[in-house]
């Protein structure tokens, strides 16, 4: 099969997709090993994308969701290739919005009666006193559409109004968008890699254990960059069942196609809640959660994983 992996090297993208260029190279090498023809194409403008259409690949593997062209316009790759009748990996534009906008994702999942952590959104000076806040402290603050733990650090967990105001201002200054404020869930943290294969879901859950800093565990950009978190299989059968049920229901509720990663957190009573969906998960060999989870919890090797991830697009191209 003739395949092009489409990426973008724009550092301004808040959402990193498969990850650095090396991740796309990892995917390419994997495709070559399983006897496909594969190249990585960096698309920075419309003429780059038109070039892909002219080459007529059988499928395109979308390593990012969109390309920002010179005019500042967003070209959503799923829409672009759909319009040109080229089969692409992953979800449609309609579904990808639930990843790009974490609030939309939470609303959709919650509307389907899937357990979801309580939250609200805010901008600076929207609330003048602690009593006005929709939720009680402690609270957890983060950007509403950023990936890879960006904007998340030890200051994200706030216990009083002065800390809350400071973090809201800091995040708003950097991201210029409403801030997502969540009830703080102090229990364990999980992520579930899900692959659609032959009409069934292969769901692979793992626990993520960030290192303790100032007595708390926070999975922020520093931890993710340093790879200092531990990934572990889940051995408690009750927890495992709960996580799998939430992850699979969320996958279906959001209309995810081919693959996706569902993040789940536990509260102190042991109840699990949907946190967010990642529909273009990192694929850097050796460090990204998606391939690591597959290896740790299901012994699915990298090449086998890539093969499973692209099969839906191959089927649709025929």
Q: Which stretches of residues belong to each language-model region?
A:
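C-terminal active-site "lid" helix and adjoining low-complexity regulatory extension at the edge
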Residues: 257, 266-318
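A short, flexible beta-alpha/helix-coil linker loop
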Residues: 9-13, 146-148, 228
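ATP-binding N-terminal substructure of ATP-dependent carboxylate-amine bond-forming enzymes
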Residues: 1-88, 94, 99, 123-130, ...
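Phosphate-binding site of ATP-dependent enzymes
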Residues: 161-245, 266-273
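Short, basic/aromatic recognition patches
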Residues: 248-252
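Flexible, glycine/charged-enriched surface loops at secondary-structure junctions
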Residues: 180-182, 257-261
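Active-site nucleotide/adenylate-binding loops and adjacent lid/helix of ATP-dependent enzymes
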Residues: 2-7, 25, 46, 53-54, ...
